Amino acid sequence: MSNKRIEQSEIEKYWEIFASLSNGGTHLTGAQAAPVLKNSQLRDDQLERIWDLADVDNDGNLDFEEFCVAMRLIFDLVNGEYADVPPALPDWLVPESKAHLVQASRALTGRQVQFERVEDDDDTPGLKDGFDWYMSPSDKSKYEEIYAANRDGRGDITYTLYSSLDVPDTDVRSAWNLINPSAAPAISKDATLAFLHILNNRHEGYRIPRTVPPSLRASFERNQIDYQLDNQRVASPAQKWGVTGGEETSTGRKAKFGETYMSRLGLGGKSSYRPAGTDFSGTKTTEDWEEVRLKKQLAELEAKIEKVEAAAAARSGGRRDTKPALVKRELEQLLDYKRRELRDLESGEGRSKVGASLKGVADEIATVREQVDGLEAHLRSREQVLEELKQEIENEKISR
């Protein structure tokens, strides 16, 4: 499995951008997202493909999770992680809450993959094959009693059933993913009965099944309405993505699953992320688009100057005229000045301390580019005059 992930610091940074663009809304339209996406200076066709990949639910808008996906894809492209937009969304970038949509899409296009699961303990001694989905009347009655004693006002279950069962956490996670592919915080009665049946059979020595009969899965997903308004208000952006601030535990995957499982059941931390109004443009990061683009423009300017010098030297037969040499010195001095400004911006020195923006430097580079173009035109006109003078001299010699 890939070690890549969207870090908590990235999520908080993306939230600042999302909150400023959405004006308190939950989704971004194409018009709202266009300014920040086009600021990357990627081609329009690339941005269109990134939008298609990020818009997992195909509703024509981006919610916060989808916006995070789009931003990470853009940053990876700008910084050379990808040569082009990937044909499919990498598994590590798929939002957990939308994994079922991606799986359905891949199934329709012939690229179906399984949901992320902890590996089955196939070598565990004593486990048997032959799991039977049939519930005996006595077992079903027992499951219904547990359900009735723990359901909430809407008839859903949101508590940790596995705490009283002698079942490994990895198997609990496999069973939960199996009956709850949409990663909802609560499950219905039918799904609860199936969940208890799977865990009961695992306790009796049967392996967790890998699939659910289609008819049974349909009953899990029928009439699923999200009443948990607090889930949208309380959960922080980092919590939505399963980020826990880098905490490590000695129990490895089981502990990680426990945290994810509690979060899915709505029993996670109560803290929430609240935008503090931080100016995102002042954030120091090596992945900042303006900085990357400025370095690229400086490299293009250097290449252009070298090209002009080579062309001038070729035309003059290796001789250096006073005017081109002066132009070169001026351009070199200007280039050194721009390099010093870039170093100051990267290190936080110079004008960057009082709020000088990379946008201003980019504007100055555009001005320099225009000056270079003007000097090239002037050089060509002077060369043309020189050629005309040479031609007049030759004509005068011939006439004599």
UniProtKB/Swiss-Prot annotation:
Binding site for Ca(2+): 55, 57, 59, 61, 66
Keywords, sorted A to Z: Actin-binding, Calcium, Cell membrane, Coiled coil, Cytoplasm, Cytoskeleton, Endocytosis, Endosome, Membrane, Metal-binding, Repeat
Encoding gene (name): end3
Entry-linked InterPro entries: EF-hand-dom_pair (IPR011992), EF_Hand_1_Ca_BS (IPR018247), EF_hand_dom (IPR002048), EH_dom (IPR000261), End3 (IPR025604)
UniProt GO MF annotations: actin binding; calcium ion binding
Segments forming a coiled coil: 286-400
Similarity-based family: Belongs to the END3 family.
Entry function: Component of the PAN1 actin cytoskeleton-regulatory complex required for the internalization of endosomes during actin-coupled endocytosis. The complex links the site of endocytosis to the cell membrane-associated actin cytoskeleton. Mediates uptake of external molecules and vacuolar degradation of plasma membrane proteins. Plays a role in the proper organization of the cell membrane-associated actin cytoskeleton and promotes its destabilization.
Keyword Transcription regulation belongs to the record: no
Protein name per Swiss-Prot or TrEMBL: Actin cytoskeleton-regulatory complex protein end3
Domain EF-hand stretches: 42-77
Organism the protein comes from: Sclerotinia sclerotiorum (strain ATCC 18683 / 1980 / Ss-1)
GO biological process: actin filament organization; endocytosis; endosomal transport
Subunit structure of this chain's protein: Component of the PAN1 actin cytoskeleton-regulatory complex.
Segments forming domain EH: 10-100, 139-223
